[in-house]
Every structure is written in C-alpha cells, then in structure tokens.
Amino acid sequence: MQTLRKILEQAEANAVAIGHFNISDLVTLKAVFEAARDLNAPVVVGTSEGERQFIGVRQVAAMVKSLREEYDFPIFLNADHTHSLLSAIEAAKAGFDWIVFDVSTLPFEENVRQTKAAVETLKALRPDILVEGEIGDIGSGSEIHDAAPDLRKGLTTPAEAKQFVDETGVDTLAPAVGNMHGMLKSMVAGNTKKRLDIERIRAVKAEARIFMTLHGASGTDDDDLREAIAAGMTVVHINTEVRLAWRRGLDSALAKQPDEIVPYKVLPQAVDSVKQVVAARLALFSTGRRARPAVQ
C-alpha cells in the first residue's frame, strides 16, 4: 500500500485534495470508511484532543489499523489540533500517521520555536510520521456559532508562511485564508456560506511550496472549495458537517422509532446520514482543475 506522503504527492500532481473527516466514535468511523471505500478514495480520519480523550488514543489507532489491514485500503489517522508535545508523542507512539501540532495562538516566533522542537522530537521517534504546523487565526470549536469572529488580523501572509516552513521543517502547513472552525446558524440553515481568499491561498502556496491543509472547511461554498484546491490546498478538513449529519440521522431514527432501545437498530441511520455527507465531499475534492506550484 502507498504511504500517506505518496498519496499526498499524487493529489498534489493531479490538483485534487484528500478528504479529512473528524470522528468521535465507531459510527462516524464506519461512515467515513464506507463512503471512501465505495468511491475508492484515500481518506484521512482525524481526532482532536477532546475526541481522542473520549474514544481512546490507542483504541482509535487500533480500529483504523484494523480497517486498513483487513481491507487493504488507504485510510490514515491524524492527531488533529494537538496543543502539547506530550499529547503529540502519545499519538505518535500509538501509531498515528500524522500530527497537527497546533500552537498557533502563541506569538509567531514562539510558535516557530515550539513547532520546530516538536518536528525534531517526533521525527526522531517515528521518521515516517508527518507533522503539520499552523499559523494564523481560524477560530476554535467545530460547533454552531451565532456570529463569526473577526479573523482578518490573523490571516496568513506568504512571507510568514515561507519563514515558518523554512525554520520548522514541517511536512504540511495549515494557513488562515478566510477559513473558520465551526459553522454559523445561518450556514446550518443554508442561507450563507463561508468564502475563502483564493488569491491568498495561491500566494502562500507559491512562497511556501509545501502541502497545505484547509482546516474549518464545513459550510464553505462549493466553488470556493474547488478553487482553493486548484490554488494549492492538498487536504481539506471537515468536522462540523459530520457532527451535524450524525445528529440529524440520530434524531430522525429516534423520531421514527421512539420506543427502540437497541443501539444497532437506531445507529445505522446516523451512519447513512454521515456517509452521504462524506461521499459528497469526497466527490467534490476529487475534481481537478489546473496545475499549481509544486512541492519541493
């Protein structure tokens, strides 16, 4: 089976993106895996520190490994938004394929210093592991928000992206380009969409020349996602849309079967609801547009 790095290289060459979907339990993992397998699309599942605390670090690593080995399918595991080196080391030792080391709330120079140290430590522990760094401000919480925070001052510049990549040695970069964690109530209702700064993505990519990840993509305009991928995004993170689909599927199942107490008779509708969202996103991410600056 191809390595995660090789799969990212192929996505980069074809100007398509790999889908990354956060999971919290077996229901969401099952849905993401089935959708990806149906489409024969490589996929990454991610768990934040909170999600890992609930599902278990070693437990989620074992589940993903079992799917990959039993079905010989390229599903990979990411330790999403890991805020401490100890937590990153725990995930690396458990067998995670990728670590998002996120200390982006710190001043830039301190972010560089800590991320560089994390890269060195994690690569010494597991030379094959991928490490991502984050710069800029994209808010916090894959939840439903009443209003959008003002993130304009936290947008990533091409110059700082290049400096960050050069000084830290990260494998992938998560910039702030108009993206935002979570969704607004108006987005959930279908009345508004997130819009991205496509020219900023293109400019950051041209300077950093590295795999780039779009975090906080739930609720983003479809055309903007296509353009963002064409401009240089190699990975796209979806979490809030997965959570919404899980809740809607579960609510629908319980409404139809109010007296049902058997989990395996209720949960399949939540699986199907999440699966539909994941399949639609994977199909969108796999549509290439045009050539973009290569990763060196």
For each feature predicted by the language model, list its residue ranges.
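Thr-Gly-centered strand-to-loop micro-motif
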Residues: 214-216
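Alpha/beta enzyme core
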Residues: 2-10, 14, 26-51, 57-76, ...
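Short amphipathic alpha-helical segments at helix-loop
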Residues: 17, 103, 262-266
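C-terminal alpha-helical cap/extension of soluble enzyme domains
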Residues: 221-296
